[in-house]
């Protein structure tokens, strides 16, 4: 099988610096040696525009960005201004994928009114993004307050926002007690990017301050692990996605990893093994 490009979250690079005591440049070059050359970046991290040259000097580019919005509650003018400035910054870095975290529905909200407003702002963002050749995406965000945390929720947005695409986070459907494999079958036609996230129930995956566990909707605690080291079934999902024609980046994600560099290395090794 063809080996897709590998991306890693920039936050993991920074976490690895704190864990290892190494400089950012040293960690990036170590990640490069594992096979990564893309970065998934929280947009605010890119406000210092000198990062573009720094990343390039280390052998990296920005493969995707993500940013949080509150489309369901913010004033329309404010949302549009934030959309425009966000897209301009993403375009400066050459990012072609933009994951919009569109906001949440709270207990006392008029749920349908908030979702309708989200759809309107996402439609505007998709239209604006076309000017830069950027694809706007939603993901299966692992929070019950996100109306796009489930397969059915995502299907609603995909069907009601023309041109909106899907970032398939392989590990987030587990939060909602849904099967990632079944989600892939239903949403495959919308996928434009993949976050390769695995989950583990193994408490040995806890970090030093026991802050990296996340409860699924049943209350069971999930821990981050290297891609391919947990129970999600990463190998089968990724093999099928590539066989079905997915040729984009595989973005390794394991926020809160007890040892970010080790997990990056193991994730890259596993993905190369799966796609031999």
Language-model features: locations:
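Active-site groove signature of glycoside hydrolases
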Residues: 90-111, 135-142, 251-252
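Acidic-and-aromatic substrate-binding clefts and catalytic sites of carbohydrate-active enzymes
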Residues: 15-20, 38-51, 70-79, 106-109, ...
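Acidic/histidine-rich catalytic cores of soluble enzymes
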Residues: 57, 65, 127-231
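Surface-exposed, active-site-proximal loop segments in enzymatic domains
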Residues: 67-83, 102-115, 217-221
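N-terminal pre-domain/capping segments
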Residues: 1-96, 163-165, 201, 268-276
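Generic structural signal for well-ordered alpha-helices
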Residues: 24-28, 48-52, 83-87, 119-126, ...
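Residues at the N-termini of beta-strands
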Residues: 38, 97, 193, 248-249
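A cross-domain feature marking catalytic cores of carbohydrate-active enzymes
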Residues: 8-12, 41-45, 64-69, 100-102, ...
């Amino acid at each position: 099988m063809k080996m897709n490009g590998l991306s890693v979250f920039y936050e993991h690079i920074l976490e690895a610096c704190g864990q290892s005591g190494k400089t950012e440049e040293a960690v990036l070059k170590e990640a490069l040696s594992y096979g990564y050359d893309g970065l998934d970046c929280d947009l605010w991290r890119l406000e210092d525009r000198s990062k573009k040259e720094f990343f390039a000097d280390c052998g990296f580019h920005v493969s995707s960005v993500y940013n949080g919005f509150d489309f369901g509650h913010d004033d329309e003018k404010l949302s549009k201004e934030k959309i425009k400035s966000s897209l301009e910054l993403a375009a400066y870095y050459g990012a072609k994928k933009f994951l919009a975290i569109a906001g949440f529905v709270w207990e006392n909200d008029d749920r349908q009114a908030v979702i309708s407003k989200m759809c309107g702002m996402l439609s505007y963002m998709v239209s604006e993004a076309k000017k830069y050749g950027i694809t706007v995406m939603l993901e299966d965000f692992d929070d019950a307050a996100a109306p796009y945390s489930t397969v059915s929720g995502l299907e609603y947005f995909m069907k009601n926002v023309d041109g909106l695409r899907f970032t398939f986070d392989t590990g987030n459907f587990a939060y909602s007690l849904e099967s990632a494999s079944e989600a892939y079958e239903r949403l495959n036609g919308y996928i434009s990017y993949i976050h390769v996230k695995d989950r583990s129930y193994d408490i040995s995956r806890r970090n030093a301050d026991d802050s990296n566990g996340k409860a699924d909707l049943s209350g069971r605690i999930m821990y981050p692990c290297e891609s391919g080291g947990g129970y999600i079934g990463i190998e089968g999902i990724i093999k099928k996605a590539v066989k079905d024609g997915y040729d984009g980046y595989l973005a390794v994600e394991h926020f809160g990893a007890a040892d970010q560099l080790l997990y990056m290395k193991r994730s890259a090794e596993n993905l190369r093994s799966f796609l031999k």
